[in-house]
Amino acid sequence: MLGWCEAIARNPHRIPNNTRTPEISGDLADASQTSTLNEKSPGRSASRSSNISKASSPTTGTAPRSQSRLSVCPSTQDICRICHCEGDEESPLITPCRCTGTLRFVHQSCLHQWIKSSDTRCCELCKYDFIMETKLKPLRKWEKLQMTTSERRKIFCSVTFHVIAITCVVWSLYVLIDRTAEEIKQGNDNGVLEWPFWTKLVVVAIGFTGGLVFMYVQCKVYVQLWRRLKAYNRVIFVQNCPDTAKKLEKNFSCNVNTDIKDAVVVPVPQTGANSLPSAEGGPPEVVSV
């Protein structure tokens, strides 16, 4: 027994497996499990960190969307509500009505063209009557109305029919009046007026009344065409609405006041003969010649 114990003390690693105690084997098993957990933990932490980095970093597919959204955002500059262009020195923007927001600005030329084409003198949104100064062009510079072929055809047919109808009515009235005058002379001689005279008189009255009504209706159409032609060949200068002009002046004055309040006064050093440095008050320096 003593020899065997001495051999074990000299070489403890050569102990057979069946002779080791269960406590030693349990400690070794716990150590192996902790080592395996330590080996697996870096992989998990790395995967978690990679997931966090993926969630935090923006994907490449969303970058162009953000850029496209920024490009689609509307500009805050004032634009014309007809042509959607900005104003410049040649064609500035005016505020002719009481509309607010982006609909209050319009070009003078765009508004002039719209008034000529629509033949209206008020805003279609707020129904405010424009303050206009009109002036007709010289007759040499008049332009034709912009009409379709069907409208021109209708006008030509109506004028032709009107001329023919007026000619027929005038000729029939002349003939009836002439014959009626002859019958009146014969009746004065005989002392009796026959029934054809009264029949002709009724026909003349009906024809004359119908001719007057027809001429009145046609003349209304011609007057409307004449007004359209005059409106198309006039120079219009629309003035700013007084209400909107006052609001713009108030806003401008408020902005100027805020800019003045926010301005910082920087003191400027005086560079004069009186502002000499304090060192010059001491004894003068001697310069070697």
From Swiss-Prot:
A zinc finger (RING-CH-type) spans 72-133. Residues 222-279 are annotated as: Responsible for down-regulation of CD86 and MHC class II cell surface expression. Ubiquitinated via ubiquitin-conjugating enzyme E2 D1/UBE2D1 independently of lysines, leading to proteolytic degradation. Has a short half-life. Instability/short half-life permits rapid changes that allow efficient induction of antigen presentation once antigen presenting cells, APCs, receive maturation signals. Small changes in protein levels significantly alter the cell surface display of MHC class II proteins. Residues 59-69 have a biased composition (Polar residues). PROSITE patterns: ZF_RING_CH. Expressed in antigen presenting cells, APCs, located in lymph nodes and spleen. Also expressed in lung. Expression is high in follicular B-cells, moderate in dendritic cells and low in splenic T-cells. Residues 43-58 have a biased composition (Low complexity). Zn(2+) 1 binds at C80, C83, H107, C110. Its EC number is 2.3.2.27. One of its GO terms (molecular function) is ubiquitin protein ligase activity. InterPro entries: Znf_RING, Znf_RING-CH, Znf_RING/FYVE/PHD. Interacts with CD83; this interaction antagonizes MARCHF1-mediated MHC II and CD86 down-regulation. This is E3 ubiquitin-protein ligase MARCHF1. It comes from Homo sapiens. The gene is MARCHF1.
